Amino acid sequence: MTIEATALAYKVADISLAEWGRKEIDIAEKEMPGLMAIRKKYAGQKPLKGARVAGSLHMTIQTAVLIETLVDLGADVRWASCNIFSTQDHAAAAIAATGVPVFAWKGETLEDYWWCTRQILDFGDGQGPNLIVDDGGDATLMIILGYKIENNPSMLQNAGGNAEERALFGQLKAIYEEDSNRWHKVAKEMKGVSEETTTGVHRLYQMMEKGELLFPAINVNDSVTKSKFDNLYGCRESLADGIKRATDVMIAGKVAVVLGYGDVGKGCAHSMRSYGARVIVTEIDPICALQAAMEGFEVTTMDKAVKEGNIFVTTTGNKDVVTLEHMKQMPDEAIVCNIGHFDNEIQVEPLNEYKGATKLNIKPQVDKYTFEDGHCIYLLAEGRLVNLGCATGHPSFVMSNSFTNQTLAQIELWKNDYKVDVYRLPKALDEEVARLHLEQIGVKLTTLSKEQAEYIGVPVTGPYKPEHYRY
């Protein structure tokens, strides 16, 4: 791949880790049949030829397989992680060694993070991306916020907020001083973004409602083969992996409090119960609360659960669901972690500023806070994604579902001219993604007869369910 002289080649922790990363990528490919089938299907066609793709998504081994799929399909790709702790350094090195510009390492500062995001949006010679693969919406946010600043530079004078906002505005200010029309030019060339996660999708819909969205978006998260698999089954395995790698704690016999019972919360609650924990769920939604109760979980408020829990897991995508006051009341040695996209589900900044607690780093991504009354808690991954900060995220097979959707979305956006809106992939593609993964796990599908298909009013080859079906 040719790298523009004006664009940085890569920045990773240690390029010498590339060989190790390549060995793990080879293993992951065998567990990612969807992506490998896409490569085979489009071999020689190069449906993404000419596309400049900026990726802001956890730089893991599984993501490496996605990146190489996009490259195989003809795309010019630049990549950064969407979380300061989620990069697997050997994966980043392996991809950088192939010539794909990667800007990611585990343990970035917030300033590093937004610098890396800036790099993936610069393809050299004044060019930005045509397409974005986003996870959490930060790459999209940088373009849209930069665009707004160019329309109203006074926004730079009012930049404050938390540390993350200050880091973002620092980059945007530097870009504005270099080129006061940069983001207008980038937005003009954009064909669209495909968004991976619930939080990012919420951002897209909010931008659309406010009239701020500048280019089309495909909501990959709400594809059934993403949300009902990655969010549910992926979290069911990777949550426990993160907690155990971080703490070596015995989960059996503990009380686990899972805040939120959406798809992610469901996976987490079932994970903790499968290890022998007694699980308490908190919810705002009466439907989700009823589901949790019907599964046998106790459902109550955080104010009541806070004094019982030994392990607290936030899954809501909302802010301030675990407050400083909650942490003051938790039992001694409680473990606090988050598996939602951002760190604001837990009040980490107020905790760090609180004079009545002493912080002690135990090891990377494990911090002990001792309060003035003598009790302590353990905060994992500084309140960021525990499964990626303290472990390696979801297994390859379930990520193949998600990333096959991402690849199809990128092709869809590149090949077609969508109006500015938020879209979902059609049901037929959702079913095709599932179909591509069946042989790997020995599944044999029953085939409808023509008469049976006519009787229930569906095509013999699908799709079999209406768009509103909830699986």
Curated annotation (Swiss-Prot):
<feature type="binding site">
    <location>
        <position position="283"/>
    </location>
    <ligand>
        <name>NAD(+)</name>
    </ligand>
</feature>
<feature type="binding site">
    <location>
        <position position="387"/>
    </location>
    <ligand>
        <name>NAD(+)</name>
    </ligand>
</feature>
<dbReference type="GO" id="GO:0004013">
    <property type="term" value="F:adenosylhomocysteinase activity"/>
</dbReference>
<dbReference type="GO" id="GO:0071269">
    <property type="term" value="P:L-homocysteine biosynthetic process"/>
</dbReference>
<dbReference type="Pfam" id="PF00670">
    <property type="entry name" value="AdoHcyase_NAD"/>
</dbReference>
<dbReference type="GO" id="GO:0006730">
    <property type="term" value="P:one-carbon metabolic process"/>
</dbReference>
<dbReference type="InterPro" id="IPR042172">
    <property type="entry name" value="Adenosylhomocyst_ase-like_sf"/>
</dbReference>
<keyword id="KW-0520">NAD</keyword>
<dbReference type="GO" id="GO:0033353">
    <property type="term" value="P:S-adenosylmethionine cycle"/>
</dbReference>
<feature type="binding site">
    <location>
        <position position="196"/>
    </location>
    <ligand>
        <name>substrate</name>
    </ligand>
</feature>
<feature type="binding site">
    <location>
        <position position="231"/>
    </location>
    <ligand>
        <name>NAD(+)</name>
    </ligand>
</feature>
<keyword id="KW-0554">One-carbon metabolism</keyword>
<comment type="pathway">
    <text>Amino-acid biosynthesis; L-homocysteine biosynthesis; L-homocysteine from S-adenosyl-L-homocysteine: step 1/1.</text>
</comment>
<comment type="similarity">
    <text>Belongs to the adenosylhomocysteinase family.</text>
</comment>
<comment type="function">
    <text>May play a key role in the regulation of the intracellular concentration of adenosylhomocysteine.</text>
</comment>
<dbReference type="InterPro" id="IPR036291">
    <property type="entry name" value="NAD(P)-bd_dom_sf"/>
</dbReference>
<dbReference type="GO" id="GO:0005829">
    <property type="term" value="C:cytosol"/>
</dbReference>
<dbReference type="Pfam" id="PF05221">
    <property type="entry name" value="AdoHcyase"/>
</dbReference>
<feature type="binding site">
    <location>
        <position position="60"/>
    </location>
    <ligand>
        <name>substrate</name>
    </ligand>
</feature>
<keyword id="KW-0963">Cytoplasm</keyword>
<dbReference type="InterPro" id="IPR015878">
    <property type="entry name" value="Ado_hCys_hydrolase_NAD-bd"/>
</dbReference>
<dbReference type="InterPro" id="IPR000043">
    <property type="entry name" value="Adenosylhomocysteinase-like"/>
</dbReference>
<protein>
    <recommendedName>
        <fullName>Adenosylhomocysteinase</fullName>
        <ecNumber>3.13.2.1</ecNumber>
    </recommendedName>
</protein>
<feature type="binding site">
    <location>
        <position position="226"/>
    </location>
    <ligand>
        <name>substrate</name>
    </ligand>
</feature>
<dbReference type="InterPro" id="IPR020082">
    <property type="entry name" value="S-Ado-L-homoCys_hydrolase_CS"/>
</dbReference>
<feature type="binding site">
    <location>
        <begin position="260"/>
        <end position="265"/>
    </location>
    <ligand>
        <name>NAD(+)</name>
    </ligand>
</feature>
<feature type="binding site">
    <location>
        <begin position="197"/>
        <end position="199"/>
    </location>
    <ligand>
        <name>NAD(+)</name>
    </ligand>
</feature>
<feature type="binding site">
    <location>
        <begin position="339"/>
        <end position="341"/>
    </location>
    <ligand>
        <name>NAD(+)</name>
    </ligand>
</feature>
<feature type="binding site">
    <location>
        <position position="135"/>
    </location>
    <ligand>
        <name>substrate</name>
    </ligand>
</feature>
<keyword id="KW-0378">Hydrolase</keyword>
<feature type="binding site">
    <location>
        <position position="230"/>
    </location>
    <ligand>
        <name>substrate</name>
    </ligand>
</feature>
<feature type="binding site">
    <location>
        <position position="318"/>
    </location>
    <ligand>
        <name>NAD(+)</name>
    </ligand>
</feature>
